[in-house]
Amino acid sequence: MRLSRRKFIKDASMSTLAMTALSKASPAAFAQTAHSSDEPQENAQAQQFSALADKPPVRPHPLDLDENFIRMPLAPEDAIYGRLQGAHIKEFVREIVAVSNKCRDDGIRFWGRMAGTKYDDMTEALVESKFRDFGLEEVHRQYFDLPPQVFPTSWDLKATGSGQTLDFDSVVPFPRSQLTPGPMDLEVVWVGLGTEADFVGRDVRGKLVVVYSWPMPGVVEHSASYNGALKRAADKGAAAVLLNVAIPGNFQTAVILRAGSLPAVSMGSEDTARLRQLLEQGPVRARLQITTETKPGLRDANVWGVLPGVSDEDIIVMAHHDSYFGGALDNASGVAVMMGLAEYFSTVPKSQRRRTLKFVTTAGHHAGSAGTQWMHDNRATFLGKTALMINCEHVSVVQAYFDRTKPELRKSTNIDARRWYVNGSDKLAEIVVKNYKTFGVTIYDVMDPYTTGDMSHCDHDAPAIQLIESAVFYHTDHDTPEIVPAPGLEAVARSFAKIIDQINLHDRQELLG
């Protein structure tokens, strides 16, 4: 029996997490186990490498990461796909992220390309303009009414103990957090990973519970989401929750979880370490306040553009456009590849396009995915002659590692592998996987059994493929163009272009699963 991705990671990781909990779960418990050493635990790692650090430095040799990413050369028979250039596609990424940055610069504290906001509308206008520039036909917006949207507007967290008061720059409310009933003055309790064992002997009723969560690989999934830590805190009577997804640095994060009906915030690792050190000195109280605004009457849109083909069948290339923070990986990278493909195929004569190509940036992924839900609801007619759907989502991100000597992330010259999905025949899967290999698109060893992301609403309604990777930078304020390698965009765009060309040699019936 094939395990789901969630269960596989959960089962494979919990033993490691349990070992991590020995040093992280409780400041008090940690102090009790530290008597065997005369040195503080936090110095142990530094001591391990002190002899190396004492060596005289050698001449440094800087590395230009952008110039050294792995890039596959084109075979002569694939020279036509050389027109899809990563540097050009990345300019689309920068243009889209600039919309998010304007939101931030306009003073919106919970910033990004949020569904239903004017910045979301600006992104749609940008895509619409590109489609017209490329000469696409039937360019239009398809609007959807959104349910009332909740936006955190202001928040604050201060911690006081042992004669000190700390402020924290990296605090962000969960996007779906409850607001606080005015300022809350709460005792702080550290519960480590938040397993049932971590709660033993701790009274959390009416208190602010701090959960330390191991990234798996980041904000999208982490130990607290697997082990039910937040629900456990709520069930045991906590008044509020503070979550740290233990990414090195001091990342601001948008955590898509609920803590029951509790107010909930996330905080970066450096700020969390400061809070933990304060707890190690004695009791700590926190002042927490979250204010939200509910906005009814908002709308979002699919933006469509069409390149007619010679038959009545079609291929749909989609990518959602809303985001938290800069959203370069999520999902300017996908929208940029989708636009790059639209531009590329606009230069192909209609007589050489067997099927109509429909390009769409889809509406409100973080607000219910109205755009792809509409496709599902109208699948009998809208998708009845669709030969392939391609979802472009989080398609290129630098491969990063945890440094072994200090709490830092280290980037590499490689590009993260993507989770991949094929709904269709063995022939379709053969075409897809072969072209990923041809163009150097790194993928996981086992296909996802289902899609995550925006296409999950309609992925069973027609032959479909997807690439997606929700890396450590996903849903953080470090999701910037700098972590989106141009060669990764290029490789994905080229592979999708050739997949389109090759499936056009096959009848739709041959592509169905």
Predicted regions and their residues:
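His/Asp/Glu-rich mid-to-C-terminal helical/loop segments that flank catalytic regions of hydrolases
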Residues: 472-513
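N-terminal hydrophobic or amphipathic helices/low-complexity stretches enriched
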Residues: 39-120, 125, 129, 134, ...
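Metal-dependent peptidase/peptidase-like ectodomains
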Residues: 310-312, 362-466
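N-terminal export signals
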Residues: 7-31
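Noncatalytic luminal/extracellular "stalk/propeptide" segments of secretory-pathway proteins
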Residues: 91-94, 103-208, 215-216
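Sec/Tat-exported extracytoplasmic proteins
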Residues: 84, 88, 93, 97-104, ...
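Soluble metallo-hydrolase cores and metallopeptidase-like ectodomains found primarily
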Residues: 168-201, 256-329, 340-343, 347-348, ...
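Second-shell loop/turn segments in exported
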Residues: 75-84, 108-121, 190, 215-224, ...
